[in-house]
Structures are given as structure tokens and as C-alpha cells.
Amino acid sequence: MRPLLRSGSMGAMTAVFVHGVPETPAVWHGLLAALDRPDTVALSLPGFDSARPAGFGATMDEYADWLAAQLERLGDPVDLVGHDWGGGFVVRVVSTRPELVRSWVTDAAGLGDVEFEWHDFAKIWQTPHAGEDFWDQQLAAPTEERAGVFQMFGVPQEPALDLASHINRTMADCILDLYRSAVDVGRQWGPDFAAIPAPGLVIIPSEEPFMSAASSTKAAARASARTAALEGLGHWWMLQDPARAAAVLREFWATLA
């Protein structure tokens, strides 16, 4: 699966960014511009602004395995950064394939909490018929109306319109399959998310509506990771304040040996 964005040469330490749902790698555009790091890769999850491979079930384990395979292709250990479900796949990869990373950053550490509870949107998507009805309505709505949902959660207008414009049937079907595979994600992935050898950073936005700070903090402690609180920012922190997001990453990476 191709990276959407890439700069620099593969001889340098690579930073790999993984988006969430319903998103594309474009969520990282502003942050990467502010970061100005010489070698970055922003991956496109299968089925999200890219084709869904034949036979790909879009389950949480298949996506995590897919990410591990992408990192293997890069060769050397990477600085891995994930948001939303991308952050969840980071949780899984550093738990099962820690040799693939030099460091890791996630805003979805709660998926590695054995007591994790899903948010209301997830529960709809995990429910047969209700999930299909939700996405049927979204796909039938004008792009501007879909963008309004993102704006309700703090996304500025232009990136909200971009996010909304990329939602399609393939993406919706992948989201349904992903969430239905992950009803018990905390109990399945949580036990392995402990004492991760590579340095980690868990980002905790104060206005995050989909994952509790308590769950993220508890999971970070079990994984031996640091935490970074982002006051005043929400789920799409990298779109709300790209410069601040880049500064947090630079500060963390500066501590690595």
C-alpha cells in the first residue's frame, strides 16, 4: 500500500504517521508542514482513500498486521505516530512487534486498557442495521453537511470539508467491519500493552470526546510511556493547532538517545 506523503531520503530515521477513521492521510498535512522533518511517511489505510484489497476483511488485527508489514518494508526502526484508530494500530504493533519502532506516539492508548469502553458512535457502528443506516444517511448528505459534523468537534472549515469529501461507500464498509471486529478490543489487546521497551508518548487532549483521559493515562502507565496533555484541543488536535502538535512531537523526539 503506497504512502500518500513522503519527503527526504530513506537513509535518515523515518517518522511514520497513521491516520484514523473516517479520515485520510491528509489529516497530517498541516502538522507535517509545521514539523519540517526531513523524512516522513503518511500511510493510507486500506479502504481509506485507497483500494480495499481483495479478501481484506478490514478487522482490527488485519489492519495491525498491515501496518507491521509497512514498517518491515522500511527496514530500520521508525518513529511511529498514530491518531484515532491509527493510534490503536500503534498500540498493537508496539505490543507485538516492538523491534519495528525506535519510538511511538498515540492518542488512542485507551484501546490498550483492558477496561476500555466504546463511545456512542462506535456502539451504533457495531450494531447491525443501525450502523448501515448511519452511513447511508451520511453518504446521502451533502458534503457541507457532513463537514459540519467534523466542525462540531473543533475541526476548522477547510480540513472539515476535505475530510467530508473523501467519505465513500468503501470507507464506510471498512469502518463497519473494523468496529465490529473490535467490540472487545481492550480485553483482547490490553494484556499485551505493557512495559513496551521503546520510548512512548501518549497524547491526551483535554477536549477529547471519544476516549477518557483516565483510560489513556492508565494505559500509558502500564506501557511505561510518558503523557502529554493538550489543553484546549480535542480529537483532531493536529488539525486544530498543527504548530503546537509539531512542537510536542519535536520535544519528545529530542529526548531520544
What are these regions (language model features)?
Residues R2-M13:
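Short beta-strand-to-loop junctions in surface cap/lid or active-site-entrance loops
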